[in-house]
Amino acid sequence: MSSSNPRGIPPAQFFEFKELSMEEAQGHLEKFQEAIAKYKFMETSVVRRVASLDDKIPDIRKTLQSVQFLKERQGDSFTVTYELNDTLNAKAEVEAKDNVYLWLGANVMLEYTVEEAEALLTQKLNSAEETLKACKEDLEFLRAQVTTMEVNTARVYNYTVLLRKKTKM
């Protein structure tokens, strides 16, 4: 596994020690817990982004397929069945035109030529898939960092237990 992350997530260092005082050990334990909390927060954020992209990518793909269908049928008319409600469908005769309207979100809809729409949707799909791949890499990296910090915590905690046993004797 690489020791660095291309998106700036700091790597966790494996903590090497020979002897620590109880105060030093407690200080390290606090730092480790803080680092674990930061990594978990980043992980939660990345998981949300992955979920969002998992929702968006099929929609973009479906819209792109529709635009490509319109491009193939340009100038022809065809019948479509569309959903009005959960239990109500309707049929319509549609003539494929040179322009399409794409819903961009935030109450914005723009008119594009079929070629422009196809290029835009292809670019958006590629971008979303690359972002999803990067997010999955980040998740793997973050989970490895959390594991490293948990191992550090366990080692220092076990050392403090050993110190307590020695002081009781």
From Swiss-Prot:
UniProt cross-references to Gene3D superfamilies, sorted A to Z? 1.10.287.370
Domain of life where this protein originates: Eukaryota
| Gene Ontology MF annotations | tubulin binding
For this UniProt record, give its keywords in alphabetical order, as a comma-separated list: Chaperone
Q: Which PANTHER family match?
A: PREFOLDIN SUBUNIT 3
Q: Which family does it belong to?
A: Belongs to the prefoldin subunit alpha family.
What does the UniProt record say this protein does?
A: Binds specifically to cytosolic chaperonin (c-CPN) and transfers target proteins to it. Binds to nascent polypeptide chain and promotes folding in an environment in which there are many competing pathways for nonnative proteins.
Self-association and partners: Heterohexamer of two PFD-alpha type and four PFD-beta type subunits.
Give the protein name, as stated in the record: Probable prefoldin subunit 3
The species this protein belongs to is: Schizosaccharomyces pombe (strain 972 / ATCC 24843) (Fission yeast)
Q: What is the lineage of its organism?
A: Eukaryota, Fungi, Dikarya, Ascomycota, Taphrinomycotina
